Amino acid sequence: MQFLGPIDWIFVVLYLIVIAAVSVWSIRKSKETTSDYFLANRNLGWFVIGASILASNVGSEHIVGLAGSAAKSGTVLGHYELHSYIVLILGWVFVPFYLRSSVYTMPEFLERRFNPQSRRLLTIIQLISYVIAKASVTIFAGALVFNQFLGVDFWTGAIILVVVTGVYTVLGGLHAVMYTEAIQAIVLLLGSLVLMIFGLQEVGGWDALMQAVPKEKLNMFLPLSDPEFPWLGILIASPIVGLWYWCTDQHIVQRCLAAKNEQEARRGTIFAAFLKLMPFFIFLIPGLIAYALHAQGKIQLDDTNAAFPVMVKSIMPVGLRGVLAGGLLAALMSSLASVYNACSTLYTIDIYKKSHPEASEKQLVKVGRIATAVIVLLGMAWIPLMGRIDDGLYNYLQSVQSYLAPPIAAVFLLGVFFKRLNAQGAYSSMVIGFILGMAKLTLQIFQHDLTPGSFWHSFATMNFLYFCIYLFVFSIAVLVIVSLSTPPPPEEKTAGLTFSTTVAEDKAASRASWNAWDVALSVIVLVVILSIFAYFSPLGIAG
């Protein structure tokens, strides 16, 4: 159903014109080198980095999924939206090692620290993860939103946006992606903030909302008996997924690799950590508002997945609806562009360049563009398949990530802290962990064909949070045992890539890159997170 008026369409068209203009400007500015195309010539400041990190994270699955999940399950999935502390870990722990190694990709860093086999394996895992956990979900959710907002045929709208996003990504590389992302982040956040404000006014204010929503929906720490989100499971598993996503995933870390220097990269992550606090309120809280308005009889909410667009349709005035439409277009285009560029970088640097070391700069850029075009086509091919995904896209996304994250998070985290860990341990941990994770996902998909009570059925239906924890511990055990059972890594594999092997000169340079303000701002982020946890717990509003 179409509910945008002429004024709304003016906002949508103006937004698209601005994005097109920025893309053309960045394309003309591009220098046609791999450093420029894939890492924006390593010349970006903290504001663009921070805004781009958030824009890369916030996709249409957030708009459709998070608000819908809040309307259905309450605030418990807010754990994943309060990962600002993990973003700080990226800036304070991992960024110095990544920048000193001057790598283009995360698999390349893994080769520096371990061996080429680890690099190749991580490349394959990351490319698979982009298909099953990022691009496909984003395309499906974005197409759904596009249909509900603009009244355009579901598949037609998806194809148009996927192609438009692919064109400016192919032509402009990371320059086009990051500068348009900075704009899109602002549009998306402001539009969603306006919706939350109007929603609170409609429901009667914050206190009225807290009274209208049952206490169990306001509790972020559900009982251990909860079948989906027991507090112990989500409290431990959520940071594991966060470490993988924020600290080792190509399409997030790539923003930091494009920084002018370590100071700009770290401050970009601090800025992103502040921005990351906002989705909890502007995406999750509207879901609670939709639940409350439905309970009050003010809106009709037959499908919780439609919570966000139903609110826009019901309570937003003409004109501002266009702002939200622009924000949702921004979310879809930003996430897809980020995935396209990350996949292009992974393929070109970690696969093509390894087999064609003599390739020129222009040839690599050309291959990158071709790779992006292929990814665009694969994304379009996935659209019909996404119709088979059950409701609850956000839940699906988190469960898939819980099966992919543990071994990679273990290898990266322990790899920078302990120099004794070697390539054999890292490779074994990732191979075994990946096989177990994919086995869990496959059996879960076909669980209805398994005999209830059997081992395989029990394995398939195991809570995804607990499975994530078990797999993380098991991956660490494999990593440590195999490493200690084999010779230590050669010195060149650890020099400057672990805390104990960082030379004094690098330590001094890293220390000079931050000051008391950086520390104070980071502490403020942590205090805000703890305050939110306390408020939405049995000690606070849910008590």
Where do the language-model regions lie?
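Membrane-embedded helix-loop-helix hairpins and adjacent transmembrane boundary segments
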Residues: 1-543
